[in-house]
Amino acid sequence: MIVNVAGAGAGKTTKMADIIMAHDIPDGKVVFCIAFTNAAADNIKEKVAEKVNGVPDNIKISTIHSFLYKELIEPYYYFLYGKHFGQLSTSSLPPSNCYRSKKLFELEQEGSLHITKIPEKAKWVVYQKSKDTKEVKSVRKKVLSYFNSYCSAIYVDEAQDISKDIYDVLSALERAGVEIILYGDPKQDVKGFGYFRQIIDKSSDVHYFSDCYRCPQIHLNLSNTLAQKDEKQVANCENAVGSLEIVFESDIDDVKEYIETENYGLCYISQKRGEFYTHSSETIDECFETLRHEVFRAMQEKWREETTEIEIERAAYFVAEKMLENYDQTGNLSLIHI
């Protein structure tokens, strides 16, 4: 994999758009450019379109989930596992693992694939699934060979969001001959997957971009204290000089007046109030979601032909809420009046 590491404000999207446009795409092949959000994908499309008055047909730009589903699962999953998914589901899932698994199983029985399972299913297509038969492995080789025959390269934006399943997918495609080019910033791995950092450490083809077109150097001096040596950033000479100070609320009589008087260009205030939990889930929320799921299944079985799934979801939410309110007041979970 070719790895490009660039921090915030380094112009990653613009750089990637330039390199994509310069990519020598053979006749009959396409280049895929994938991002992790719709906004990021739209931004890349805009950058590419600006350079050539529209996105060429041999450059496919989409979100990662759209790519995995449309390019891997939809055309090939049936040939390996004899199952076709007719639609995608974005319905909420219960927090309880038991009920979550039940919900996912029910969706698949109905021919629906939940969006959270897309990376795993795509991994089964190109990488492996436990207990694969020889026949499945043989078909997978043909799938990879065919995909490589028309895919010239895959560019990945915001690569710090790569999860284990997506890493396995990209690794399998690379072994099949597809060129993989990553752009990202491990310092922005807010989801904590850690796979982009592992890729950087293992790769022999890593490029660092230190320029920052967004922040004053004085701000970067602070952030650089937390960055690895190769990932420290330098402000562009045209950036504003800027200033940096930290003010505690206890030292200020009137926060609103202080901010308005000082006339800051940007000001970020972090304020939270309430009860906070350090354990993984809140019992009340889990009870509600479990109850809502059961109510939804019962309603769906009765009214699936008469109304939409979203309307049933709304009704289940309302009924579950009323049932818990009734339980708090009477100790009885049954719903007497709505």
Model regions: which residues?
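The feature marks helicase ATPase cores and/or their adjacent C-terminal helical subdomains
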Residues: M1-I336
